[in-house]
């Protein structure tokens, strides 16, 4: 157990699970969408639904969607900032079955017409898990430089992506592969030991059969 696990992150309170973690969920969801959300339909599950409003979970999620960090003093006023930014937000409750008690379903629409559905959980101490993207099961938290590649479920893509990273001396710490159905869309999540050069990311985006590439950089957090 690290000191971070005991003390938690630098944040605007009151709770590392219901506030700091919720901000990070919103922030990473915005990054995965790839642009500023213009609308967000958010459904809270379990403990988030029961006590989230009193702990500021709703405002924290919105703050993250606006690009705020857990220590941003504007978090308590995030609804006002969302209105100024032209972002429409609705809240409800959802039964996500066996999901972690501090979970939320976010259905996002972006200013460029993009749409995305994300299920995420706050695990405590500011740590989170992205549990599903557009119905495809995933499991990552953005605690190290992370590459999320959405591609066609066909042979060769795993080797191609790994080779691109190897050419830049980027070491892959963990790699997880997910797919909705055989031959459909698949998701690769690669957690790396160092930051990935922008030219490498652009090279991956230009590969045939790669549908979307998202990079979670620690330098941006």
Predicted segments — roles?
Residues 77, 91, 119-221:
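A conserved regulatory-domain signal marking ACT and ACT-like small-molecule sensing domains
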Residues 9-26:
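Conserved phosphate/anionic-ligand binding catalytic regions in large, soluble enzymes, centered on
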Residues 32-41:
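Non-transmembrane, aqueous-exposed alpha-helical and coiled segments at domain scale
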Residues 66-115:
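Contiguous domain-boundary segments centered on the initiation and propagation of an alpha-helix
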Residues 51-59, 101, 186-194:
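Short glycine/threonine-rich loop-to-helix capping motif typified by GTGT followed
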Residues 1-11, 40-43:
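Short, hydrophobic/aliphatic alpha-helical segments
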Residues 21-33, 155:
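Alpha-helical support elements that line or immediately flank enzyme active sites
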Residues 41, 45-84:
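A structural-propensity feature for long, helix-poor, extended segments
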């Amino acid at each position: 157990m690290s000191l971070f696990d005991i003390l938690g992150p630098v944040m605007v309170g009151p709770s590392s699970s219901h506030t700091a973690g919720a901000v990070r969920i919103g922030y990473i969801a915005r990054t995965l969408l790839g642009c500023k959300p213009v609308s967000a339909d958010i459904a809270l599950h379990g403990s988030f639904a029961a006590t989230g409003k009193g702990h500021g979970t709703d405002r924290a999620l919105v703050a993250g969607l606006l690009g705020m960090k857990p220590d941003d003093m504007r978090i308590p006023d995030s609804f006002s900032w969302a209105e100024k930014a032209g972002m429409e937000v609705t809240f409800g409750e959802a039964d996500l079955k066996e999901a972690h008690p501090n979970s939320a379903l976010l259905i996002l629409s972006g200013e460029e017409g993009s749409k995305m559905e994300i299920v995420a959980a706050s695990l405590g101490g500011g740590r989170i898990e992205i549990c599903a993207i557009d119905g495809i099961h995933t499991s990552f938290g953005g605690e190290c430089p992370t590459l999320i590649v959405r591609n066609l479920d066909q042979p060769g893509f795993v080797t191609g992506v790994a080779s691109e990273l190897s050419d830049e001396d980027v070491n892959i710490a963990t790699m997880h592969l997910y797919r909705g159905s055989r031959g459909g869309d698949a998701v690769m999540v690669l957690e790396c030991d160092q930051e990935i050069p922008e030219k490498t990311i652009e090279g991956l985006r230009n590969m045939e059969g790669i549908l979307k590439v998202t990079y979670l950089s620690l330098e941006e957090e």
